[in-house]
């Protein structure tokens, strides 16, 4: 592990190029109340030199007023930003923090441990690549620990760092550590995790967080940060079929027409055959345009403008996908919901469903079952209350293009929006695509379009800000 150097060390241009090209890992911290999630993130920020002098001064002042570490600096206050959190010593909202090393950039979400904030945790986990599940070494696995392991599994996170915290308070006992690891592995066996990496640490003292600790001579593996630097990122998304929801149609003049968006999965190159959903029109990629020039290939996570060889009618909400594995068109979905609204969800409820860049009307046709968030077992249900997880069938007012969530997290997820308040009511994961009651359009191709680039300086400046490759 190396902490990133200052820009003065080797020049600003080189510094910017180095950090622009680094991979980004999004991860969440979760666990029971007072397991030390916020302290762990504070330690990562502190020991990777991400805190400015004025923040240190403010932290020392706040530690005297709100701290829980006696006379010592309370690193948790770097993350617990709400007044209610500081006064209660708990995390309520999802707090996002950013930091980087020479090897990788990180976006970390500190998610709440209380049951009543399950919806907040689901929000933080929905975009994460990895979960850091904290366990207090004194208490071992708790009901909340198991609940969070199940939730991150349901949300498609396949890699877990089991951070057994406060090991200094149990004398760095190897027996205690191994007992917790064994219990977690037994519970997580049916949860389909591809990797569980157990790390003993002390977030308060910094042992095995950024730098190796010296107290546990029996632990010879890497500290937490080194694991976060080395774990594979987005490997499943890169291997998945190409998908790009259209954010806007880029047509600055009559000679140029392209479709701009963020590639959700897979990769694409000029000459590749693609299908535009929901129209079913087919074409090939003529150009991959960015403000910095054309690309020979673009992949997951890049914002680009795709120019097609044919004049295809598409707008915001459409999805461009590889013709080898097109999306399914449907107006009915079986969805697993993480219900966040205070009012109960019952059959007949009318909401908006936002899928990618498209928003449609959705009616709850049926509520089938509720999932116990501690055991994963399903039971019959006719409604969902706040923080419930359940399976429902949605009927939409028109066809949309989707994948099952197990195949693609981006094109297989949605949010439900309350039509009266416009509040987010639920996070939804597509479990099964129900056969559509409408006839899907036949794939067709159209008139060849011009692939000549736009030459406007103003356009290029705008593209560099918004859709630079």
From Swiss-Prot:
Entry EC number(s): 2.7.7.4
Region named G5: 202-204
Location of region: G2: 89-93
Catalytic activity: sulfate + ATP + H(+) = adenosine 5'-phosphosulfate + diphosphate
Start and end residues of each stretch annotated as G4: 165-168
Keywords carried by this UniProt record: ATP-binding, GTP-binding, Nucleotide-binding, Nucleotidyltransferase, Transferase
Location of region: G3: 110-113
Protein's pathway: Sulfur metabolism; hydrogen sulfide biosynthesis; sulfite from sulfate: step 1/3
Segments of this protein annotated with the region G1: 31-38
PROSITE patterns the record matches: G_TR_1, G_TR_2
Gene3D superfamilies: P-loop containing nucleotide triphosphate hydrolases, Translation factors
Domain of life according to the entry: Bacteria
Binding-site list for GTP: 31-38, 110-114, 165-168
GO biological process: hydrogen sulfide biosynthetic process; sulfate assimilation
A GO molecular-function annotation: GTP binding
UniProt-listed Pfam families: GTP-eEF1A_C (PF22594), GTP_EFTU (PF00009)
Residues in tr-type G domain copies: 22-237
NCBIfam families hit by this protein: CysN, PRK05124.1
Role of this protein: With CysD forms the ATP sulfurylase (ATPS) that catalyzes the adenylation of sulfate producing adenosine 5'-phosphosulfate (APS) and diphosphate, the first enzymatic step in sulfur assimilation pathway. APS synthesis involves the formation of a high-energy phosphoric-sulfuric acid anhydride bond driven by GTP hydrolysis by CysN coupled to ATP hydrolysis by CysD.
Subunit structure: Heterodimer composed of CysD, the smaller subunit, and CysN.
Family of the protein in this entry: Belongs to the TRAFAC class translation factor GTPase superfamily. Classic translation factor GTPase family. CysN/NodQ subfamily.
Name of this chain's protein: Sulfate adenylyltransferase subunit 1
Taxonomic source organism: Methylorubrum extorquens (strain PA1) (Methylobacterium extorquens)
């Amino acid at each position: 592990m190396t902490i990133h150097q200052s820009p003065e060390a080797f020049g600003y241009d080189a510094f910017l190029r180095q950090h622009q090209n680094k991979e980004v890992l999004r991860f969440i911290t979760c666990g029971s109340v007072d397991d030390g999630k916020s302290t762990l993130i504070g330690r990562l920020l502190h020991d990777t030199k991400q805190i400015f002098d004025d923040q240190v001064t403010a932290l020392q002042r706040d530690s005297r007023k709100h701290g829980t570490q006696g006379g010592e600096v309370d690193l948790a206050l770097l993350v617990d930003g709400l007044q209610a959190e500081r006064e209660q010593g708990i995390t309520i909202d999802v707090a996002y923090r950013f930091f980087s090393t020479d090897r990788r950039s990180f976006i970390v979400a500190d998610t709440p441990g209380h049951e009543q904030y399950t919806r907040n945790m689901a929000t933080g986990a929905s975009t994460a690549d990895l979960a850091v599940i904290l366990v207090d070494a004194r208490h071992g696995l708790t009901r909340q620990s198991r609940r969070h392991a199940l939730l991150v599994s349901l949300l498609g996170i396949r890699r877990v760092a089991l951070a057994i915290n406060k090991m200094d308070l149990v004398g760095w006992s190897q027996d205690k550590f191994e007992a917790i690891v064994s219990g977690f592995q037994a519970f997580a066996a049916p949860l389909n995790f591809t990797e569980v990496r157990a790390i003993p640490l002390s977030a308060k003292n910094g042992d095995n967080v950024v730098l190796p600790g010296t107290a546990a001579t029996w632990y010879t593996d890497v500290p937490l940060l080194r694991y976060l630097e080395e774990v594979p990122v987005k490997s499943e998304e890169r291997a998945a079929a190409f998908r790009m929801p259209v954010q806007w149609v880029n047509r600055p003049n009559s000679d140029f027409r392209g479709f701009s968006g963020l590639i959700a999965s897979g990769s694409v190159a000029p000459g590749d055959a693609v299908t535009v959903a929901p129209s079913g029109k087919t074409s090939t990629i003529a150009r991959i345009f960015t403000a910095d020039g054309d690309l020979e290939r673009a992949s997951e996570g890049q914002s680009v403008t795709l120019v097609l060889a044919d004049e295809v009618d598409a707008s915001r909400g459409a999805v461009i996908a590889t013709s080898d594995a097109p999306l399914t068109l449907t107006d009915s979905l079986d969805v697993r919901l993480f219900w966040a609204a205070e009012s109960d969800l019952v059959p007949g409820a009318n909401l908006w469903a936002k899928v990618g860049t498209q928003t449609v009307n959705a009616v709850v046709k049926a509520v089938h079952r509720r999932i116990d968030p501690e055991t994963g077992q399903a039971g019959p249900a006719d409604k969902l209350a706040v923080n419930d997880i359940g399976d429902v069938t949605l009927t939409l007012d028109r066809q949309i293009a989707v994948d099952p969530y197990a195949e693609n997290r981006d094109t297989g997820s949605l949010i439900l929006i309350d039509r009266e308040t416009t509040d987010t009511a639920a996070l939804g994961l597509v479990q099964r695509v129900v056969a559509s009651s409408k006839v899907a359009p036949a794939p067709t191709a159209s008139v060849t379009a011009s692939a000549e680039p736009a030459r406007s300086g103003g356009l290029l400046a705008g593209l560099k800000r918004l859709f630079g490759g």
